[in-house]
C-alpha cells in the first residue's frame, strides 16, 4: 500500500512538472512565417507560407503547441500550385488552417497565380484536394464556421472584408462587407475571427512585416460588425519601449487557439536579429500564452511582448521526432522538409539503387528566376555546419554541382565542384549579389575520389571549405548580412541547397549525393 501511494505521488509530481515547464522560442525555427493553427481533438496542426518554394504550405503536428513535427505539405502537386515566375516576394502568401465537422481546410493566396483558393482533406497526413478558387480578393484569407455557414475574411481593398462562401464550390453567397480597417497602421491584413462568450473577435496585423509589425484586435456582438477596437491595442508588438531592445523583432501575423485544458495561446511570426537590424533566418514561428482580462480582452504574455526563453506553464509536453543530423537518401524519397525553387522537373531527381540522390544537370542556373535542379532545407540556426559529399559524373566544361547558401535568385553563395576543358576537377566559391558575380577562389582537386563540401556559419559569417581524404581545406568566408532580408529583399529566409547546373543544353552531367548533414549549435533553439 505504501509503495502504491508513493508511485501515485511520483506520477502526480511528474504530471505537474510536465504541465509547468517553460519552453524556448522560436518553436519552429528558420523560414516558417505567417503561422496559423487549429485544434482537432487533442491534436494541433499548424501551417506556414512558402512563397516561391515547392511543395507549398508546410504542415506541422503537435500535442503541446511547443514541440512540432512536419508531417507533410498541403500543396504537393503542380495542379494545386503553379509557381511560374515566382520569387521570394510572390508565390504562396499567408495560409489559414481550420477544422470543422471532420474536415480540414487550408485557405491561402497564390499571388503569382489566380489569387485566393482553398484545399480540404479529412486526413491531414494524406493528399489535399484540388484548389477551390474563391471570388473575394485580397491576401491572407481566413475561414470561420458557425451554424452550418462558412465565412471568409480577407483584405481586398485595404479593409478587412467579410463574406459567406460555400467552401466546397467556392461560390460567394453574400456580398463582401467592410468590417474593420484596424487602428490606423499600414497594411491591415492577416484577419482571423473567433467567438468567445457571445463576442466575435477579429484579430489582424498592421504595420507591415518589419520593425513596426503589430497585432491588434476588435470585437462585436455580430459577425458582420460593427467592430470596436481594444482600447489596449496593440496586444502584441516589439515596436515600443518594452520590445525595442529584444533580439526578437517584427512580431505580428498571429493566430489564437484554445488548449485542451482551457488555456489560450497565440502563435505569431517574428525574426531573430543579427547585430543591427538584419535577419537571415527568415520570419519564424513563436508561441505565447494568452489570458483574458476582466473586460474580456486577450492579454498576450502579460505585457504584449515575447522572449526567447518563456518561463510559463504549458500543456503537458511531448517531444516530437526531429530532423536527423545526417539525412540519407536510402528510402528513395525526400522527407517533407525538402523544397525546390518553383515547380521542379521530377525527372531531374533520381534515387539510385545504392541509396544516393542523383541530380541531373540542366542549363538553368540559380540566378535564372526559373526552376534549376536544386533541393534545399531551411537554415534553422545562426551557428551551424552543413556538408555533403558530391561526385560529379559525365561533366562537360564548366558543368558544376555543389551546395548553395540561397536567399534569392540574385543573392546566393555557391560552393561547387566543376571540370575544365582538360577534364581536371576544381572546387570553387562564388558570390552572387545583385548584378555582381564574384569568383572568390578556385583550386585544383585530385583527379579521382570523393569531395565533401562544407559550409559553416555563425551570426556574422558563412565559412566555406572542403574535405579530401578527411582533411579540411578552407576556401574563404562571406558576411551573412548580404543575404539578409534587409539587403536582399523578399519575405523568405536562407535555405541550404544541393544543386547542379550545366553550361550546355546537351550536357549529360549528373551529380550523386550520398547524404546531407546539418548540425546546429547545441542549445541555440532550446
Curated annotation (Swiss-Prot):
Pfam families: GH43_C2, Glyco_hydro_43. Pathway: Glucan metabolism; xyloglucan degradation. The record marks 140 as: Important for catalytic activity, responsible for pKa modulation of the active site Glu and correct orientation of both the proton donor and substrate. One of its GO terms (cellular component) is periplasmic space. Keywords: Carbohydrate metabolism, Glycosidase, Hydrolase, Periplasm, Polysaccharide degradation, Signal. The active site is at 34 (proton acceptor), 189 (proton donor). It comes from the Bacteria. Its main location: periplasm. Its EC number is 3.2.1.55. The keyword GTP-binding does not apply. It is found in: Periplasm. It catalyses: Hydrolysis of terminal non-reducing alpha-L-arabinofuranoside residues in alpha-L-arabinosides. GO terms for molecular function: alpha-L-arabinofuranosidase activity. GO terms for biological process: symbiotic process benefiting host; xyloglucan catabolic process. Optimum pH is 6.0-7.0. Residues 1-20 form the signal peptide. Belongs to the glycosyl hydrolase 43 family. PANTHER family: BETA-XYLOSIDASE (PTHR42812), BETA-XYLOSIDASE-RELATED (PTHR42812:SF12). Gut bacteria supply the human body with energy from dietary polysaccharides through glycosidases that are absent in the human genome. Xyloglucans are a ubiquitous family of highly branched plant cell wall polysaccharides present in the vegetables we consume. Enzymes involved in xyloglucan degradation mediate the conversion of otherwise indigestible plant polysaccharides to short-chain fatty acids. Alpha-L-arabinofuranosidase involved in xyloglucan degradation by mediating the cleavage of terminal non-reducing alpha-L-arabinofuranoside residues in xyloglucan branches, converting the 'S' units to 'X' units. This is Non-reducing end alpha-L-arabinofuranosidase BoGH43A. It comes from Bacteroides ovatus (strain ATCC 8483 / DSM 1896 / JCM 5824 / BCRC 10623 / CCUG 4943 / NCTC 11153). The lineage of its organism: Bacteria, Pseudomonadati, Bacteroidota, Bacteroidia, Bacteroidales.
Amino acid at each position: 500500500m505504501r509503495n502504491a501511494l508513493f508511485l501515485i505521488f511520483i506520477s502526480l509530481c511528474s504530471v505537474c512538472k510536465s504541465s509547468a515547464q517553460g519552453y524556448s522560442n522560436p518553436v519552429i525555427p528558420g523560414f516558417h512565417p505567417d503561422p496559423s493553427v487549429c485544434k482537432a481533438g487533442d491534436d494541433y496542426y499548424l501551417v506556414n507560407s512558402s512563397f516561391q518554394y515547392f511543395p507549398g504550405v508546410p504542415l506541422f503536428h503537435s500535442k503541446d503547441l511547443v514541440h512540432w513535427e512536419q508531417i507533410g505539405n498541403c500543396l504537393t502537386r503542380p495542379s494545386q500550385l503553379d509557381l511560374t515566375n515566382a520569387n521570394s516576394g510572390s508565390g504562396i502568401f499567408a495560409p489559414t488552417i481550420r477544422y470543422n465537422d471532420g474536415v480540414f481546410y487550408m485557405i491561402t493566396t497564390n499571388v503569382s497565380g489566380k489569387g485566393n483558393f482553398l484545399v480540404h482533406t479529412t486526413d491531414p497526413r494524406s493528399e489535399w484536394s484540388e484548389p477551390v478558387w474563391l471570388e473575394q480578393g485580397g491576401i491572407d484569407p481566413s475561414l470561420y464556421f458557425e451554424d452550418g455557414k462558412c465565412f471568409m475574411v480577407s483584405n481586398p481593398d485595404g479593409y478587412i472584408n467579410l463574406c459567406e462562401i460555400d467552401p466546397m464550390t467556392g461560390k460567394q453567397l453574400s456580398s463582401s462587407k467592410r468590417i474593420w480597417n484596424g487602428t490606423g497602421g499600414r497594411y491591415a491584413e492577416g484577419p482571423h475571427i473567433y467567438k468567445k462568450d457571445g463576442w466575435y473577435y477579429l484579430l489582424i496585423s498592421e504595420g507591415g512585416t518589419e520593425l513596426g509589425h503589430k497585432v491588434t484586435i476588435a470585437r462585436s456582438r455580430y459577425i458582420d460588425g460593427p467592430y470596436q477596437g481594444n482600447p489596449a491595442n496593440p496586444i502584441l508588438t516589439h515596436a515600443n519601449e518594452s520590445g525595442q531592445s529584444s533580439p526578437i523583432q517584427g512580431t505580428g501575423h498571429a493566430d489564437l487557439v484554445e488548449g485542451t485544458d482551457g488555456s489560450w495561446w497565440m502563435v505569431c511570426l517574428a525574426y531573430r536579429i543579427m547585430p543591427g537590424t538584419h535577419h537571415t533566418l527568415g520570419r519564424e514561428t513563436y508561441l505565447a500564452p494568452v489570458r483574458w482580462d476582466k473586460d474580456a480582452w486577450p492579454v498576450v504574455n502579460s505585457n504584449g511582448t515575447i522572449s526567447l526563453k518563456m518561463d510559463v506553464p504549458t500543456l503537458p509536453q511531448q517531444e516530437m521526432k526531429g530532423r536527423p543530423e545526417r539525412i540519407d537518401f536510402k528510402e528513395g524519397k525526400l522527407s517533407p522538409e525538402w523544397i525546390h525553387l518553383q515547380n521542379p522537373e521530377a525527372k531531374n531527381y533520381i534515387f539510385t539503387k545504392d541509396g544516393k540522390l542523383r541530380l541531373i544537370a540542366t542549363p538553368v542556373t540559380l540566378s535564372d528566376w526559373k526552376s534549376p535542379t536544386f533541393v534545399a532545407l531551411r537554415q534553422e540556426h545562426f551557428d551551424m555546419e552543413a556538408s555533403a559529399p558530391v561526385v560529379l559524373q559525365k561533366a562537360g566544361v564548366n558543368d558544376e554541382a555543389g551546395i548553395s547558401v540561397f536567399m534569392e535568385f540574385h543573392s546566393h553563395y555557391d560552393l561547387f565542384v566543376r571540370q575544365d576543358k582538360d577534364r581536371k576537377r576544381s572546387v570553387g566559391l562564388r558570390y552572387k549579389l545583385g548584378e555582381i558575380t564574384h569568383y572568390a577562389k578556385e583550386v585544383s582537386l585530385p583527379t579521382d575520389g570523393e569531395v565533401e563540401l562544407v559550409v559553416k556559419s555563425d551570426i556574422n559569417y558563412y565559412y566555406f571549405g572542403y574535405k579530401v581524404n578527411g582533411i579540411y581545406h578552407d576556401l574563404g568566408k562571406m558576411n551573412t548580412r548580404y543575404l539578409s532580408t534587409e539587403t536582399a529583399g523578399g519575405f523568405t529566409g536562407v535555405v541550404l541547397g544541393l544543386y547542379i547546373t550545366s553550361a550546355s543544353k546537351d550536357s549529360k552531367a549528373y551529380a550523386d549525393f550520398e547524404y546531407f548533414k546539418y548540425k546546429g549549435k547545441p542549445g541555440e533553439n532550446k
